[in-house]
Structure formats: C-alpha cells, structure tokens
C-alpha cells in the first residue's frame, strides 16, 4: 500500500492522526520511518541501511530513495544532515564526503525521488525539535538548548517551540579550545577520563553558553546520555540539565516534523 502523506486519517470514535516521514543520515547508517505527528511515535518498524562509502551526495540520495521506497511513501519528507544546511544547500561536511559542500541537497535527494518535496536540516536541530515537542523538553517554554555529545558536540536552540537553526555550539571557543575538543564524549574516551573529570569540562562549556544566551533548560543527548545518572548530577552550572528522552528516534521524528512545517533556514 502506498502512503501519500503528510496525511490525516480519521476513524469513527478515534482522534485525528497526522503522519509524516523522516530520514536520519549518519556517518554509518541511514534510517527512516513513518511518524505519528500527534504523539511523536514511529508507526511500525524503521528501515536502516548502511551509509554508502564514499558518502557522496548521489550515493546517499540513492540510499535515501531506497529507504523511502521501502515504505511506499510518496509525500513530503524530512532529511537530517550531519552539518550546516542553509536554504537546502550544504555548507559543511564532517562525517560524509567533502563533495557535499555547496551541493543543493534538497534538489539532489528530490530528483532521486521523482520530485517529492524534501526538507533538509541539521541533525542536531532535528533532534532538538523532537525533544522539545515530545521528549525531555516537553512543556518547557522559553529558551531550550539541546547538546549532543559524541564524536563532536552538536547543538540545537529552540525558543518557545521555534527552531533557531545551525548554532554549532560545538565550535564555540572555551578557554582557548573548541567546545567539542574539550567536552565531546570522544575526548572522555580518548583520555580515559572518569565521569567527574569529564563533567568539569562539560560545565565549562555549559557556562560559556549560559553567559551568551541564558537558556531555561539544557537537554543532554548523544549515546553518553544513557548514562546520565553518572554525570548529570555532577554538573554545577546554573541552568537545569536533563537527559534526552527519545534517543535513537529523535532524528527521524524531528525530520518528519520539519517536513510538515518547514522550520529550516
């Protein structure tokens, strides 16, 4: 059965459901699924394929098309990208091929899908949208900052539900180093730091962000957030910090959200 989405389905006695489709592009895998936009839950299973190597724009676009076609989805879709994207054009490339820089990803992916409408946005921005609507930031108005701790540090800023895209706080200079050189979880692993020692570096990054924009809430994401009990209580900055709630689905959900209400820049 082909899904045309974004769609609204009504059943007597049931609430109205809105469906969207999201793709999350990572350095090792490309995953996608249909999302219930009323609840933020995936409908059925997701499909995950290996990211092609080299991860050129055309190779990635073909893999995305394979995922989308696996669901028979024919409507608009959202796609995350691990870097800066403005007006559909890629500006940076870290975990993918450098040939992405300057590529109109929106058009390249759309062409592989026969002209389907594509919204593309930074992967951390997508996760931030999802977490503030359905996850750890739900019912928290004001200025919310998501930080994803991994190989680097990704960031998203959402103000009263509106995304401020491409913040790139991982490249903020903190004490003579970029924030991600100081406090990415990969730095902890490389140096074999204890959680208390690493937390001191995270505090420095959080304070630098606080001094710039005074957020109301930090959401800590990335794989290390699954062990938040070991380090979040050690953070002595002024703004509350909570672990991300959606984990592996946040990118797909946020991308699907963006496809329905284009929040990109």
Curated annotation (Swiss-Prot):
Q: Characterize activity with respect to temperature.
A: Optimum temperature is 50 degrees Celsius for both activities.
List UniProt keywords, sorted A-Z. Answer: ATP-binding, Kinase, Nucleotide-binding, Transferase
Binding, ATP: 24-29
Record EC number: 2.7.1.63, 2.7.1.2
Q: Which molecular-function annotations from GO does this UniProt entry contain?
A: ATP binding; glucokinase activity; polyphosphate-glucose phosphotransferase activity
InterPro entries recorded = ATPase_NBD, ROK
The record's region (Disordered) falls at 1-22
Q: Specify whether Nucleotide-binding is a keyword of the entry.
A: yes
Question: What's the superkingdom here?
Answer: Bacteria
Supply any other comment.
The poly(P)- and ATP-dependent glucokinase reactions both follow an ordered Bi-Bi mechanism, with glucose being the second substrate to bind and glucose 6-phosphate being released last. The mechanism of poly(P) utilization is not strictly processive and is most likely nonprocessive, where there is dissociation of poly(P) prior to complete utilization.
To which protein family does this belong?
Answer: Belongs to the ROK (NagC/XylR) family.
Q: What is this protein called?
A: Polyphosphate glucokinase
Q: Which gene encodes it?
A: ppgK
């Amino acid at each position: 059965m082909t899904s045309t989405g974004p769609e609204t389905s009504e059943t007597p006695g049931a609430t109205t459901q809105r469906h969207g489709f999201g793709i999350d592009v990572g350095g090792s895998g490309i995953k996608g699924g249909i999302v219930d936009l009323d609840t933020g839950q995936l409908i059925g299973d997701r499909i995950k394929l290996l990211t092609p190597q080299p991860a050129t724009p055309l190779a990635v676009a073909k893999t995305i098309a394979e995922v989308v076609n696996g669901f028979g989805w024919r409507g608009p879709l959202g796609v995350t990208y691990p870097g800066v994207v403005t007006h559909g054009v890629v500006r940076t490339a870290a975990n993918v091929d450098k040939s992405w820089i300057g590529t109109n990803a929106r058009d390249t992916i759309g062409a592989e899908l026969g002209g389907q409408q594509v919204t593309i946005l930074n992967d951390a921005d997508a996760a931030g949208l999802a977490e503030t609507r359905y996850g750890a930031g739900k019912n928290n108005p004001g200025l919310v900052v998501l930080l994803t701790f991994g190989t680097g540090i990704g960031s998203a800023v959402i103000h009263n539900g509106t995304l401020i895209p491409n913040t790139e706080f991982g490249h903020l200079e903190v004490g003579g180093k970029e924030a991600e050189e100081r406090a990415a979880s990969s730095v902890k692993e490389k140096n074999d730091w204890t959680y208390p020692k690493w937390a001191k570096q995270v505090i420095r990054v959080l304070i630098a962000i606080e001094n710039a924009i005074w957020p109301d809430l930090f959401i800590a994401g990335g794989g290390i957030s699954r062990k938040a009990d070991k380090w979040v209580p050690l953070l002595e900055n002024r703004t509350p910090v909570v672990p991300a709630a959606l984990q592996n689905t946040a990118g797909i959900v946020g991308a699907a959200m963006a496809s329905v209400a284009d929040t990109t820049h």
